[in-house]
Amino acid sequence: MLVIFLGILGLLASQVSSQLVGQLRPTEDPPEEELEYWCAYMESCQFCWDCQDGTCINKIDGSVIYKNEYVKSCLVSRWLDKCMYDLDKGIYHTMNCSQPWSWNPYKYFRKEWKKDEL
C-alpha cells in the first residue's frame, strides 16, 4: 500500500514540475538561454541590447545602433504555449510560442550606427 501511495505521489509531483517548465512569469530580464528566442521576434526590447554612451550593441548578433526611442523596456511572459510581449501603455503582442512571428512597432526608429559618424 505504501509503495502505491509513493508511486502516485511521485506521479503527481512530476506533473506539477512539468507544468512549471513552460511558465515564465512577467519579467524584464528573461533567462540568458532564452534571449535569442525573445530577441528574434521583438528586437527592440531593452534586454536585447547593451547600451552605453549613446550606442547600443545587440547581444545576439552584435549589430550597433544609436540609442533612441527604438530601445524599449519590455515585459515578456509565457503561459502554456502563449508568449507575450508587454511594451506598456496598452501595446502588447501575443503569439503561440511554437509558431512565433516577428513584431516590432518601433522598427522605424532604428538608426544604424556607422563608424565614420561621430
UniProtKB/Swiss-Prot annotation:
The record's subcellular locations are: Host endoplasmic reticulum lumen
Output the InterPro entries linked to this UniProt entry.
ASFV_fam_110 (IPR004848)
Primary residence: host cell
Which residue numbers does the motif Prevents secretion from ER cover?
115-118
Q: What GO terms fall under cellular component here?
A: host cell endoplasmic reticulum lumen
Signal sequence extent: 1-18
Q: Which residues are glycosylated?
A: N96
Induction text: Expressed in the early phase of the viral replicative cycle.
Post-translationally, this protein is described as follows, namely: N-glycosylated.
Q: In terms of domain of life, where is this protein from?
A: Viruses
Q: Which UniProt keywords apply?
A: Early protein, Glycoprotein, Host endoplasmic reticulum, Signal
Q: What does this protein do?
A: Plays a role in virus cell tropism, and may be required for efficient virus replication in macrophages.
Please state which protein family the record places this protein in.
Answer: Belongs to the asfivirus MGF 110 family.
Q: What is this protein called?
A: Protein MGF 110-6L
Name the source organism: African swine fever virus (isolate Warthog/Namibia/Wart80/1980)
